[in-house]
Amino acid sequence: MTIKESFEKYKIHQLQLDPFGVCNARCWYCPVKYLGNPESGKEVMSIELLEKIIKNLIDERDKEDGLVAKSFGGFYTAHYNEILLYKHFEELLKLCQKYKLCFIVLSNGVPLTPEKVDLIAKYKGVVNGICLNVPAFEAEVWSKRSGINIKQFDKLISNINYAREKLSFMVENKSFSIQVNGSNEYSFSDKGGWLDKGVDFPSDMDLDPINGELATQTKIAQELFPNMQVFSVPSLIDRAGLLDSVMTNKNAIERNLKANDPTKKVVMCGNGREVGGRPMGWLHVNASGDAFLCCNDYEFDFKFGSFKTQELADFWGKDEHIAKVEESYNTICRNCASAIFE
């Protein structure tokens, strides 16, 4: 199937919309620590542009044969940023309530202040999921791994406690969770994992799978918040090669996806394969209103449209869009753990 045929077959099922592309953390496993947030994503999206984008997608969904799937009803806000720092956060909630959309908050927890929690509770049902990405629950370890001043640690714990009480209904239905990112011995290729260490991998990290850092910090979180869903994530990725100096998936990609055959080509994205993968089944929009390739297109190198001057139908699946996907299959996607090779 050609890329053009794929656009004809698949609708947009998911949206990643990032109205403010800045993060206050510098987590050790994230490009923000090493590269900073992309400059073109640091805008504060206006409410007018935000509503234009949302209305455009709703209109396409409700058309007889629009570009957006009939099942579309929400989005993610997660291009290495903190949606809770968006100064129009309440207006975002109001817009979603108006258009009957919901979204998921991914946060490091420090900006999840009581004021933001109260807003989430006020517009109940708009935020249908909260996942806190917290790498540790001992102050010194947390500060070192998150890149946030240790003085903020008590605020983090206080925020979580307030939120789990105020949003108890989300705790009960398991839509409010804590994700502890890290590594253990089984993360690495010599033990069957998909990672290899880079020169900047934290040398002080205890990788014992039972008593090491990840296991210990996860256990502490479970003890601090016994009624919450807490899970560890030892399977980190290198963001299509951006984190090579820290950790890399390249050897695993060569071994597991290409079968050590350099002639194999990318034919599709396996992240959401059932809806066409990220390039076809998802729409990604940054704070400048630009449509770009996917969550691993960190610097927005593969832009193909702008909601500031265009509507979705002006660029989606058009020649420039197809050319950008073709280019990505020969470049960034070859270093991505979600690529499908043939």
Model-derived regions: residue spans:
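Flexible mid-to-C-terminal extensions adjoining Fe-S/redox cofactors in radical SAM and related proteins
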Residues: 1-13, 29, 33-35, 284, ...
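N-terminal [4Fe-4S]-dependent radical SAM core
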Residues: 1-16, 63-68, 257-272, 320, ...
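Conserved glycine-rich "GG(E/T)P / GGGxP" loop and the immediately following alpha-helix
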Residues: 6, 12-232
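The −1 position to Zn-ligating cysteines in a subset of zinc-ribbon hairpins
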Residues: 22, 26, 265-268, 332
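A conserved catalytic-core signature of glycosyltransferases
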Residues: 79, 278-280, 311
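Short, well-ordered beta-to-alpha junction loops that form the rim of enzyme active sites
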Residues: 180-183, 233-236, 287, 296-297, ...
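Aromatic-lined glycan-binding groove of carbohydrate-active enzymes
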Residues: 209-249, 281, 286-292
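Short, small/polar residue-rich loop motifs at catalytic or cofactor-binding pockets
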Residues: 271-279
